[in-house]
C-alpha cells in the first residue's frame, strides 16, 4: 500500500509538472491558429493577450495555484467552455480548469449552501443574472467593479472592455457595482402576424380606441 501511494503521488506530480512544461506561446499559437478563429482581433493582438495570460499564470503558480474550479448548468454554451475552452486555458497557462456541468437547480442549491456557510466549494460560479438581488443582499459575492479596479487588478485582463459585454445592467446591483460578468444569454424573439397589421378594419378600430395609427 505504501508503494502504491508513492506511485500515485508521483503520477500526480508528473501531471502537474507536465502541464507547466507544455504551457506557453507555442500552445497559444496552436489555439489561435485553429480554435480562436475567426476573431475581431488580429493574430498578433491575440498572441499579445495570450502572453498576458501566460505571465499572469506564472505568478499564480508561484503562489501555489494549480487548479481553478468552476461550475455551471448543462447547456451547449457551457459544454463548449468545459470541454474546449477549459482545455485551451490549461494548455496555454499550465493551470488546470475543472469545469463541472450540473443541472440548474443543483447550481442554485450549491450556491445557496455556499453563501449560507461562507465557504465556497468552487472558485467561480456561472449563475443566472436574475440572482443579482440575492448576490447583492447576501453580501457574500465578490464585487467585481471594485475587485477588478483594486485588489484584483493584477489578475484582470487589461484588454477587457466592459462595454463589449451585453447585459451588464442585469448583473449590476442597486449599489451600481457589477457582481457578475455576462457569459451568455438567451435571445427573446417576438413573432407577429404582419397581415393583421395591414387590415383596414383593424387599423380603424385601433385608431378609434387609442387615438393614433396602428
Residue locations for each model-derived region?
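Short, polar/charged alpha-helical segment
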Residues: 51-59, 76-94, 195
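Gram-negative bacterial Sec-dependent N-terminal signal peptides
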Residues: 2-22
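Short, well-ordered beta-strand segments
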Residues: 69-71, 125, 182
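Ligand/substrate-recognition segments at binding pockets and active sites
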Residues: 67-84, 104
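Helix-loop-helix "hinge/cap" segment bordering the ligand-binding cleft or interdomain interface
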Residues: 91, 98-100, 145-151, 172-214
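Solvent-exposed loop/turn segments at secondary-structure junctions
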Residues: 75-78, 104-107, 129-133, 186-189, ...
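Extracytoplasmic "Venus flytrap"/periplasmic binding protein-like
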Residues: 63, 87-164, 200, 205
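Hinge/lid segment of periplasmic solute-binding proteins
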Residues: 25-62, 129-189
Amino acid at each position: 500500500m505504501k508503494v502504491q501511494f508513492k506511485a500515485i503521488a508521483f503520477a500526480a506530480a508528473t501531471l502537474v509538472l507536465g502541464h507547466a512544461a507544455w504551457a506557453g506561446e507555442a500552445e497559444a499559437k496552436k489555439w489561435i491558429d485553429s480554435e480562436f478563429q475567426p476573431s475581431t482581433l488580429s493574430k498578433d493582438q491575440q498572441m499579445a493577450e495570450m502572453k498576458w495570460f501566460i505571465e499572469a499564470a506564472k505568478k499564480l503558480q508561484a503562489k501555489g495555484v494549480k487548479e481553478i474550479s468552476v461550475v455551471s448548468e448543462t447547456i451547449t454554451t457551457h459544454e463548449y467552455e468545459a470541454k474546449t475552452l477549459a482545455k485551451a486555458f490549461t494548455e496555454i497557462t499550465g493551470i488546470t480548469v475543472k469545469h463541472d456541468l450540473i443541472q440548474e437547480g443543483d447550481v442554485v442549491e450549491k450556491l445557496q449552501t455556499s453563501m449560507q456557510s461562507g465557504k465556497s466549494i468552487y472558485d467561480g460560479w456561472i449563475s443566472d443574472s436574475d440572482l443579482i438581488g440575492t448576490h447583492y443582499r447576501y453580501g457574500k459575492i465578490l464585487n467585481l467593479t471594485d475587485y477588478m479596479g483594486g485588489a484584483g487588478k493584477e489578475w484582470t485582463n487589461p484588454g477587457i472592455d466592459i462595454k463589449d459585454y451585453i447585459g451588464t445592467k442585469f448583473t449590476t446591483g442597486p449599489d451600481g457595482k457589477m457582481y457578475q460578468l455576462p457569459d451568455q444569454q438567451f435571445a427573446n424573439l417576438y413573432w407577429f402576424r404582419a397581415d393583421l397589421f395591414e387590415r383596414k378594419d383593424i387599423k380603424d378600430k385601433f385608431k378609434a380606441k387609442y387615438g393614433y395609427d396602428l
